[in-house]
Every structure is written in C-alpha cells, then in structure tokens.
Amino acid sequence: MSTTDNTNGDDRRPGQPEWDDEENNFEHLDATEVPAEEEALVESAGLDADTLADLEDAFDGVDASTEDPGATVGETSTLESELAERTEDLQRLSAEYANYRRRTDRERKVGVEAAKAKVLGELLPILDDLELAQKHGDLDEGPLKAFRDKLVSVVEGLGVSAFGAEGDVFDAERHEAVQDLSSGDDKVLGTVLRRGYQMNDRLLRTAMVIIADPAEDAQ
C-alpha cells in the first residue's frame, strides 16, 4: 500500500489540526521573552521597583488575611480596644482642660478684683477730703465740685459704694468703734467719723464710728 507524500515538509499526520504546530512552537519559545514583555509593561505603566515591591507586599498581606480569618478578627479586636483606650484618654484630658480653664478664669477674676481694690483703696483718702470739704460748704460750686462729682461717678461705676450713717445698726465686721457710749445691748452708730466703702461684696474699708443707744432708748 502506498502512502501520501507530505508536500509541505512537516511531520503532521493526516487529519491532524494545524493548531498542534502552534503548541509545539510555544514549547520552543525562549524563556527570556516573557520577562522582557513584563518589563516593557511595567515601564509603560510608570512603575519603579519600590512601587512593585510595595504592591507585592500588599497582595501578600491580603492573601495572608484571607488564608487566616482568625488573625483578622484578632487584629480588629485589638484595634477596637486601643480605640476605646484612646477615647477614654481624650475624654479625661478634655475634662482636665475644662477644669483648668475654669480654675484659671476664677483666679484671673480674683486677681483683677484685688488690683482694682488696691487702686480704689488709695483713692479713698481723696474722697474723705472731698466729703469734708462738702460739709464745710466748699463744694457748692466751682471746679472743685466738678472734680468731686466726676471722681465719685468713676468709683461708683466700678461698683464702689459708701456705707455708715448715723442711726445704722452697729456691725462689728463693717464698723470700727473708737468709742462706745451705749448703755444697753442695742447699739447704733451715734457719730460717723469716717465712712466705710465696699466694692460690690468686697470690703474696702471699715467705717470709723462712735456707738450710741438707739434714739428711742436715749429718750
């Protein structure tokens, strides 16, 4: 029996599909061609070696977490615990800062009031002299009266008020008695030698007085 000659010079058997030759050709490709193509793709994408290494590490981490779900759950629990601790620390610091602000504001106000009281205390002798001049009729008119009125207006605007008038009930905390002419338990101010002053609720100076009996008792 005669055989059919292969006029194309290849080794295909009759009826064998042509794509078998393509597979054989792939087997004979140079192994260095594939990496060269990959390198060309990397260069065209603008990636360097460090970026590729970071991407590989990221993919490795994803693969590891996928392979071990328990590790991911543990890490999440740890992060939640750390977040709770940091939240508590932040709340504590916030409360401490609020207390610090309140304390410093309070101390600042006390310092301001003390400074005002010191300055006003030095003005009180001037007010005493002006009041004495007014009793003698020297402030009925003229520039001295205008000065007195302006000074009184300023100190009153700062919350300063005078106290101590004849007939007021004696108060040992606010009145300094230089003489006691009373005969009973009820004591009032008989003579006011020097009025006292206070700034709001702060005592600037006590009033200097002579104690006497109430008017009805004296009769």
From Swiss-Prot:
Record-level GO cellular component terms: cytoplasm
Entry-linked SUPFAM superfamilies:
Coiled-coil domain of nucleotide exchange factor GrpE (SSF58014), Head domain of nucleotide exchange factor GrpE (SSF51064)
Subcellular location per UniProt equals:
Cytoplasm
> According to the UniProt record, where is the region Disordered?
1-32, 59-87
Top-rank lineage group of the source organism: Bacteria
Q: Name one GO molecular function term.
A: protein homodimerization activity
Q: What is its main location?
A: cytoplasm
Q: What does this protein do?
A: Participates actively in the response to hyperosmotic and heat shock by preventing the aggregation of stress-denatured proteins, in association with DnaK and GrpE. It is the nucleotide exchange factor for DnaK and may function as a thermosensor. Unfolded proteins bind initially to DnaJ; upon interaction with the DnaJ-bound protein, DnaK hydrolyzes its bound ATP, resulting in the formation of a stable complex. GrpE releases ADP from DnaK; ATP binding to DnaK triggers the release of the substrate protein, thus completing the reaction cycle.
According to the record's subunit comment, the protein's assembly and interactions are:
Homodimer.
Family to which the UniProt record says this protein belongs:
Belongs to the GrpE family.
Q: Can you name this protein? A: Protein GrpE
Supply the source organism for this entry.
Corynebacterium diphtheriae (strain ATCC 700971 / NCTC 13129 / Biotype gravis)
